[in-house]
Amino acid sequence: MFLSVVACFKNESHILEEWIDHYQKQGVDQFLLCDNNSTDDYQSILDKYDNIILHKDSSAQIQWGTEFPRGKYGDGIYSKLLTEHKTEWAIICDPDEFMYAREGYDTIRQFLEERGSEFNQLIVPNILFHHKPGTDIEIKEQPESVVDTFIYASRMDKNVKSIVKVDSITKLRVHEHAVEGRSTRPNLKDDFVLTEGTANSKYGCLPIVPKGGYKGSAPGGAKGNMW
């Protein structure tokens, strides 16, 4: 496979279909998913697709780094999934995170096919989205579409997620990963050396402005990864 999404979820059937459809439109080949003891009807959603690989966790709760034996890319469920199911590139994210292609490219896949030789990891900043201006307004019912409802962008969050070339990984993490070779932001100008001893927070606060600047509202989800 060329491009896969890797994620764990728990009781997120309300968003799974929109999330999977979004990434399929971005050129994703397969989804490597782990169910963390969900009690909702997620299976009826996943049954609609033929490119889902599902691991069901048998423990009380997934524990980072201890739940599964050490694999090729480190400890934990993500290493297990990526060791057993081959893919060239992986987007490791949560079901409330929607990543979009950079301006000038139709899909994330197209961007990786054309520019992927320039880096081994793309570190993408998070932006939180809300359904109305202000962060303290509660929403009473689950909207039909997260992307169409949460349209007001807040300031860029310090956290990031990554698109990573799997064969370059030396240690998997939650946000960005230790890799051999070049790690960069989506502008392809900022370089970082991320090793197993590097603290994540050192890189989480670096400012980056999306091409065209910030907008008061934009398509997004509960979280949107802006390029």
Feature names for model-found ranges:
Residues D29-N37, K56-S58:
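Short beta-strand/loop segment that forms part of the nucleotide-sugar
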Residues M1-D21:
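N-proximal low-complexity "stem/linker" segments adjacent to membrane-targeting elements
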Residues Q43-I92, Y100-A101:
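Active-site-proximal specificity loops/subdomain of glycosyltransferases
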Residues D29-Q30, E88, N120:
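Short acidic/polar active-site loop segments enriched in Thr and Asp
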Residues E67-K72, A101-W227:
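Catalytic-site signature of metal-activated, phosphate-bearing donor transferases
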Residues D21-Q30:
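Short, acidic, metal-binding catalytic loop of nucleotide-sugar glycosyltransferases
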Residues N36, D94-F98, E103:
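Short acidic donor-binding/metal-coordinating loop in glycosyltransferase active sites
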Residues A7, C34-S44:
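Ser/Thr-glycine-rich phosphate-binding loops at phosphate-binding pockets of nucleotides
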